[in-house]
Amino acid sequence: MALAHTLGFPRIGRDRELKKAQEAFWKGELDEAGLRAVGRQLRAAHWQVQKDAGIQLLPVGDFAWYDQVLTHSLTFGVIPERFRAHGEAGPTLHTLFGMARGVSDDSCCGGAHAQEMTKWFDTNYHYLVPEFSADQQFQLSWEQLFEEVDEARALGHQVKPVLIGPLTYLWLGKAKGAEFDRLDLLDRLLPLYGQILRRLAGQGVEWVQIDEPILVLDLPQAWKNAFERAYNLLQSEPLKKLVATYFGGLEDNLGLAANLPVDGLHIDLVRAPEQYPSILDRLPAYKVVSLGLVNGRNVWRCDLEKALEVVRHARERLGERLWVAPSCSLLHSPVDLEREDGLDAELKSWLAFAVQKCREVAVLARAATEPEAAEVLAALEESRAVQASRASSPRIHKPAVQARLAAIKASDAQRRSPFAERIARQRAGLDLPAFPTTTIGSFPQTSSIRLARQSFKQGKLSEAEYIEAMHSEIRHAVQIQEQLGLDVLVHGEAERNDMVEYFAEQLDGYVFTRFGWVQSYGSRCVKPAVIYGDLSRPRAMTVEWIRYAQSLTDKVMKGMLTGPVTMLMWSFPREDVSREVQARQLALAIRDEVVDLEAAGIRIVQIDEAAFREGLPLRRNAWPHYLEWATEAFRLCASGVRDETQIHTHMCYSEFNDVIESIAAMDADVITIETSRSDMELLEAFEQFDYPNEIGPGVYDIHSPRVPSREEIVALLRKAARRIPAERLWVNPDCGLKTRAWPETEAALVNMVAAARELRGDLARG
């Protein structure tokens, strides 16, 4: 039998027990002993459910109180000085949570801002970025891994501790203070890995999993050389070592990975099935090969028959050296499909969450040597039925959608006239002042808004009562904006729970789970919608709300939509058609909404593409294809309107230099971006490229409750005006105001409007 193992399991619990315990601990409602007890219960339950599913070698070290990279930072003593409490012997859970969430000014060690958080490769999980200093010292400072190994072994489990590898850990971090090469720290860090491996050996461990996902990236030669040096040094340490790669193919790093002096290599055959034959040919004859055949980051059942073809071939070549696993950690998958008691039976039969994926791995491993076992035959028969159902279901395949896709012409993804002609007509029709002021779309989601939405879903409010409650919120938002003197208004999005879910609920081809939660970071869990079939819009989604808002004012009201790429990136996508096809289907649905908004008298429509840059592939050579279809999808949804209708887009991230040409190719009339935290430095990209359209650089950070002064905003706008012609500048916050409270929102917008008026005065005076 091939060995069945997993690279990691979701830590949040079937009912988000970890989230609830974390938040209770932060509020002081649960003490540390209570929090630790919840952690122990979750780990025990997760090991047992994997074992019951047929997993033979269980991961330990995949549990984290907040984030696995942060756990490693504590383990290695990489704790910034601002979080070191004087007199404490070592880090505590309070240290860990302080690094993740920041520390208030009235705490024992004074105020300290949280560490930076960023995306874990191309997933929707976020990690805490390690902060390295040039004189960084490493020392073993956190016992969690060793305690959990003892815990699992005491329960009778065969374990495989999981470590983030030394090169990946350094790659994920940032140099703070003086600039230096993070690779300079490698020789200081490696002795800690030696200590850890020796201690694990002393605990009776046989195998350790060392995650090096940066092997699927474009690595500089110095980092490739460092891999060889590091693993040659670690070769003398005890334990069998499995280097795990995932999220892509090894490509030019294949030879490097295959020849590292370790005992096994895990490869992702879901993201990069084409690397399989080369790996077998290049790998030394003593090494274990772990095949990632079950998708660890989506919700669809595995095509067991197709996967079994690979397993059989690998078994012939590898014999006992074959292991079977998910493609990556199951952290990115919901926990257990059995919790879903309200899902349509046919749709549910197509899905697999983490527990079900463990069973699929176990079946494939067993099928390698026992192809006629009753359990294997039954699973294969069920899998065949599922694949046949998905291939032929009219719920998935919609002839009308496919015919419309086939009929798309190049001109459908082009505005009728060039920007210079459009903007002249728009300026004449909109009659806005210089430095026009607006917001990004959402206003504070108050407790009364959330209660009304919840009551409506529970049937406690009638539809008429709910509409009136939302109309009341819209009236309030419009009234405040008029009082503040904003130039382009929004309706405030009171009716929207989430910028993707709100639209997905109204599109055919999406389904929603009740318990399909995955961790985004810390206690923040998200429940992505699932795209199961061809996508279309049966009816207008936003028109009545925006039409009502426009009826309340003579000022310009802006329609607010989520773009096709963001809808796709923040959903669980289909696997039977490409992301490009799904983006086009979404673009057509959104296009219909844009056209309907124009017909309702709305003269500005904003189409948010918050996830546009997130969709970039990990390898640069794959960027051009992605950027081509992503920009085309945006233009397709935005190009059904007249020249007089102004299209805005919003992007909230902090790196534009490498995609600026593609952003220009989207051809939005106005782009609003997040720039305040960079002190407008991001605008260099737009200046150097000579970005042709209009720009609204964010003038204050909405992630902080702090109210910026008029003088601060004026200074930022003057800095922006040195880079972007004044006639092309808009004035707006960085992002939506959903998470802020009304008092700070109004105070900040008062200063923003005053700053815009001061700039207009400057302009008039020449």
Curated annotation (Swiss-Prot):
Active site positions, chain numbering: H703
Gene Ontology annotations of biological process type: methionine biosynthetic process; methylation
Cofactor mode of binding and number, as noted: Binds 1 zinc ion per subunit.
Protein name, entry field: 5-methyltetrahydropteroyltriglutamate--homocysteine methyltransferase
Superkingdom assignment: Bacteria
Lineage of the organism: Bacteria, Pseudomonadati, Pseudomonadota, Gammaproteobacteria, Pseudomonadales
Keyword Thylakoid appears in the UniProt entry: no
HAMAP family: Meth_synth
Residues the record lists as binding 5-methyltetrahydropteroyltri-L-glutamate: R16, E17, L18, K19, K119, R524, C525, W570, E614
Matches recorded under NCBIfam families: met_syn_B12ind, PRK05222.1
Residues given in the record as Zn(2+) binding sites: H650, C652, E674, C735
UniProt-annotated binding residues for L-methionine: I440, G441, S442, E493, D608
Record organism: Pseudomonas aeruginosa (strain UCBPP-PA14)
